[in-house]
C-alpha cells in the first residue's frame, strides 16, 4: 500500500512538474511578445493622449480597444502571478492557451492601429510641409513685388502672410481692375459672419504668379453679377414694392457701433481709409475685380466717374462758407472731401443755394458741373417773378455729355435736388419747351431733354423724399419765413461775400445803391409770398409735387440711407434721444407727436418713413453686406440706429459719441459701392460687345 501511495505521489509530482513547465513556457512566449509590442505600441496613457486627436468615432473606437487590451494583459499577469491557485492542470492549461490566443489577437490589432496612425501622421506631416512650401513661395513673391514697387517709386507696404486666412496688407488707394477669369456661382455669405478662411490652392498660386502686381488683400474681391442672372436671383429674393413704407421701420439694425472712447480716433480713421468696407454680392460668381495700389506717379483717379456731393437746406461749402461755419461734409471729425482726395478719388462738393427751391438748386447744380452762367429759364422766371440769369460757374466737367457720367450723393434736401436735375436732363422741362416754341429765343440745354446716360448713380442721405412735418408746422410758417428772408437781406449787403442763394430774387445790394434803398427794393420782392423756395419744397405738399414730377431711370443705381434718433415715450409718442443735436429738439418733438404713428420716428428733422424712398416709386430692401448695384429701383439700406440728421455729415461738435472713424467707415463704404457700380457697368458693356 505504501508503495502504491508513493507511486501516486510520484505521478502527481510528475504531472505538477509538467504543468509548471508548460506554464513557464507559456509565460516566456507571452513575455517575449509583450516586449515586442511595447517597442511598437505606446503605453495606455500615450494611446489615450494620441486618441484625443483622432476625429469622431474612429478615435473613440481605438481608445476603447486599447483600454480593453491593456485590461486583458493586466488580468493575465495577475493570474500568472498567483501561486498554488491551480487546482486542475487541464483547466489551467486551457485558460492559458485561451489568454495567449486573445493576447496575440490584441497585439495584432494594436500593431494594425499603430501602422494606420503612423500612416495618417505621415500624410499630415507631408501636407504641412506642402503648405509651408506654398507659403514660402508666396512670401518670396511678395518680397519680389515689394522690391519691384520700390523701384517704381511706390510707397505701399507689405506684411507676412497668415497661414489661415492669407491676410495681406491693406491698400490705402485702390483701383478696380478687370479680370476675365470666370468663377463658378457661390452662395451668399456676408463677410462679417464668415469665420472660415479658404485654403490655399494651386489655382490661386497660379493666379498670383500670373498677375504679380495684384495683391490679394484681406478685403473680399469686387464681384460682378451678370445682368440677367442678377435680375433672376433678386426677383426670387424680393419683389419690388411701392408705397408700403411701414415695413422698413421694424427689424432693421444699425450697421454702426459706438466707438470706444479710449481708442485713438486718428488711428481709427487711418485704418478705415486703408481698409474700406466691402460687401459680398448675392449669387457672387462672376469675374472678380482685383485692386492695385495707386503709384506715386499715377495721375489717373481711382474712380472712373467723378463723385459730386450736394448739400442740403442751409448748407454752405467752400469759399462761400462764413468763418465760423462748420465744414459741411464731415465737420472736424472727418473731412470727407479732403480725405477722399488724399486717397486718390475724384470728388467734389457742389455749391448751390442754401435757401432756394429745388428747381433753382437743380439748375445751379447742372451749371456747377457743366459750367456757364445759370439760366433758370424764361418761363420759370416769368412765372415766379425773379431774374432769369444767375451766377456763373467755372464747371468741374465742361465736356459733360451723354456717356460721360457722374455719381451724385445728396444729403437732406440735396437728394431731392439731384432727382429733379436728372429728370430735366432726361425728359426736359415741358414748360420751358412750350415757352420757347411760343416766344423763341434761347433755351438751356438742361430743359431740352434727351440727355440720358449722364448720371451713373444717385445716393441720398437722410433726404425727406416725402417731406417733413417740421417744415409744415414750423419751417414754412410765416414767422419763420420772414426770419429766413430777413437774414438773406442782411447778408446781401455790399460788404458781404457770402451768397445764401437768393440773388435771383434781388437779395444783393448794388454798388451805387444805399442800404435804405436796398431794403425798400427787397421788401417788394415776390419771394415773401412765393412757394419757389426751400421752406415750401420741404413740406409734405411740396415734396409730393416733386415726386409726381420725377421718374426712375432704368440706367441709374439708386440708394438711400436713413437714420433714427428718437424713442417711444410712455404715451406712445416719439421723443428725441439723448445726444440728438440740440437745435433739433423742437422739430423732433413736432414730428414725434404726429397723428399718424408710422410718421413719428425721426432723425430730428426728417421722419424715417420719408427718408426711405419716394412713396410712389418702387423700392427693395438691401443689407449692408451686399453691394447696391441694381438699377432702376430704390435700394433701401437698413436704418442706422442712433444717427440724427447731422450725424451723416459730422457737424455736431458736441456729440462725442459719434467719432470720425464712423464717418470714415460710412463714406468709404459708399465709395466702394460706387466703384462696384462702375465695375458692373463695365461688365455689362463687355457682355454686349461679346
Swiss-Prot record:
UniProt key word Lipid metabolism: yes
Can the keyword Calcium be found in this entry's annotation?
yes
Query: Cross-referenced SUPFAM superfamilies, in alphabetical order?
Result: alpha/beta-Hydrolases (SSF53474)
User: Where is region (Disordered) located?
Assistant: 53-266
- Can you tell me which residues form the catalytic site? 412, 603, 645
One MF term in GO for this entry?
metal ion binding
Compositionally biased residues, Basic and acidic residues: 72-81, 225-237, 257-266
Protein's name according to its UniProt entry: Lipase 2
Q: Which organism is it from?
A: Staphylococcus aureus (strain MSSA476)
Amino acid at each position: 500500500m505504501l508503495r502504491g501511495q508513493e507511486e501516486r505521489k510520484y505521478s502527481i509530482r510528475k504531472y505538477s512538474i509538467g504543468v509548471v513547465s508548460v506554464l513557464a513556457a507559456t509565460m516566456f512566449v507571452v513575455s517575449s511578445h509583450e516586449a515586442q509590442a511595447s517597442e511598437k505600441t505606446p503605453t495606455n496613457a500615450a494611446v489615450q493622449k494620441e486618441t484625443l486627436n483622432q476625429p469622431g468615432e474612429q478615435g473613440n473606437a481605438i481608445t476603447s480597444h486599447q483600454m480593453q487590451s491593456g485590461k486583458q494583459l493586466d488580468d493575465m499577469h495577475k493570474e500568472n502571478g498567483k501561486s498554488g491557485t491551480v487546482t486542475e492542470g487541464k483547466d489551467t492549461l486551457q485558460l492559458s492557451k485561451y489568454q495567449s490566443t486573445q493576447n496575440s489577437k490584441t497585439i495584432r490589432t494594436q500593431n494594425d492601429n499603430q501602422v494606420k496612425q503612423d500612416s495618417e501622421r505621415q500624410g499630415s506631416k507631408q501636407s504641412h510641409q506642402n503648405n509651408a512650401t506654398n507659403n514660402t513661395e508666396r512670401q518670396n513673391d511678395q518680397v519680389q513685388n515689394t522690391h519691384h514697387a520700390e523701384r517704381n517709386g511706390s510707397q505701399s507696404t507689405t506684411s507676412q502672410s497668415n497661414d489661415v486666412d492669407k491676410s495681406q496688407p491693406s491698400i490705402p488707394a485702390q483701383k478696380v481692375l478687370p479680370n476675365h477669369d470666370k468663377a463658378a456661382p457661390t452662395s451668399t455669405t456676408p463677410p462679417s459672419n464668415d469665420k472660415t478662411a479658404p485654403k490655399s490652392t494651386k489655382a490661386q498660386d497660379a493666379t498670383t504668379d500670373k498677375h504679380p502686381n495684384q495683391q490679394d488683400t484681406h478685403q473680399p474681391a469686387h464681384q460682378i453679377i451678370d445682368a440677367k442672372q442678377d435680375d433672376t436671383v433678386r426677383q426670387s429674393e424680393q419683389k419690388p414694392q411701392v408705397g408700403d413704407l411701414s415695413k422698413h421701420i421694424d427689424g432693421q439694425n444699425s450697421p454702426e457701433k459706438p466707438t470706444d472712447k479710449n481708442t485713438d480716433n486718428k488711428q481709427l480713421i487711418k485704418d478705415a481709409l486703408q481698409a474700406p468696407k466691402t460687401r459680398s454680392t448675392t449669387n457672387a460668381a462672376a469675374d472678380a475685380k482685383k485692386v492695385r495700389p495707386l503709384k506715386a506717379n499715377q495721375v489717373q483717379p481711382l474712380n472712373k466717374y467723378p463723385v459730386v456731393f450736394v448739400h442740403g437746406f442751409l448748407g454752405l461749402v467752400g469759399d462761400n462758407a462764413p468763418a465760423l461755419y462748420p465744414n459741411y461734409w464731415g465737420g472736424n471729425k472727418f473731412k470727407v472731401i479732403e480725405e477722399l482726395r488724399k486717397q486718390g478719388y475724384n470728388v467734389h462738393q457742389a455749391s448751390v443755394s442754401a435757401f432756394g427751391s429745388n428747381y433753382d438748386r437743380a439748375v445751379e447744380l447742372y451749371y456747377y458741373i457743366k459750367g456757364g452762367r445759370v439760366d433758370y429759364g424764361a418761363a420759370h422766371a416769368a412765372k415766379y417773378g425773379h431774374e432769369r440769369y444767375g451766377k456763373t460757374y467755372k464747371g468741374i466737367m465742361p465736356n459733360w455729355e451723354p456717356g460721360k457720367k457722374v455719381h451724385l450723393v445728396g444729403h437732406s434736401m440735396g437728394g431731392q435736388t439731384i432727382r429733379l436735375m436728372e429728370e430735366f436732363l432726361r425728359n426736359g422741362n415741358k414748360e420751358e419747351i412750350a415757352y420757347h416754341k411760343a416766344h423763341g429765343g434761347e433755351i438751356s440745354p438742361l430743359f431740352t431733354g434727351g440727355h440720358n446716360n449722364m448720371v451713373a448713380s444717385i445716393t441720398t442721405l437722410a433726404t425727406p423724399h416725402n417731406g417733413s412735418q417740421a417744415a409744415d408746422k414750423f419751417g414754412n410758417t410765416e414767422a419763420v419765413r420772414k426770419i429766413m428772408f430777413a437774414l438773406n437781406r442782411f447778408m446781401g449787403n455790399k460788404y458781404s461775400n457770402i451768397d445764401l442763394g437768393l440773388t435771383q430774387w434781388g437779395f444783393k445790394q448794388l454798388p451805387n445803391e444805399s442800404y435804405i434803398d436796398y431794403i425798400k427794393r427787397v421788401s417788394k420782392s415776390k419771394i415773401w409770398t412765393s412757394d419757389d423756395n426751400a421752406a415750401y419744397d420741404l413740406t409734405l405738399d411740396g415734396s409730393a409735387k416733386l415726386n409726381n414730377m420725377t421718374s426712375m431711370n432704368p440706367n441709374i443705381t439708386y440708394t438711400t440711407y436713413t437714420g433714427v434718433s428718437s424713442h417711444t415715450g410712455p404715451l406712445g409718442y416719439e421723443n428725441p434721444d439723448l445726444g440728438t443735436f440740440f437745435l433739433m429738439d423742437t422739430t423732433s418733438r413736432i414730428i414725434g407727436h404726429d397723428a399718424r404713428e408710422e410718421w413719428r420716428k425721426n432723425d430730428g428733422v426728417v421722419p424715417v418713413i420719408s427718408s426711405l424712398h419716394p412713396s410712389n416709386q418702387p423700392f427693395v430692401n438691401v443689407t449692408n453686406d451686399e453691394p447696391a448695384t441694381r438699377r432702376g429701383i430704390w435700394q433701401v439700406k437698413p436704418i442706422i440706429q442712433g444717427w440724427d440728421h447731422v450725424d451723416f455729415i459730422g457737424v455736431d461738435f458736441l456729440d462725442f459719441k459719434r467719432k470720425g472713424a464712423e464717418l470714415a467707415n460710412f463714406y468709404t463704404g459708399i465709395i466702394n459701392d460706387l466703384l462696384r457700380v462702375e465695375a458692373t457697368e463695365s461688365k455689362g458693356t463687355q457682355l454686349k460687345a461679346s
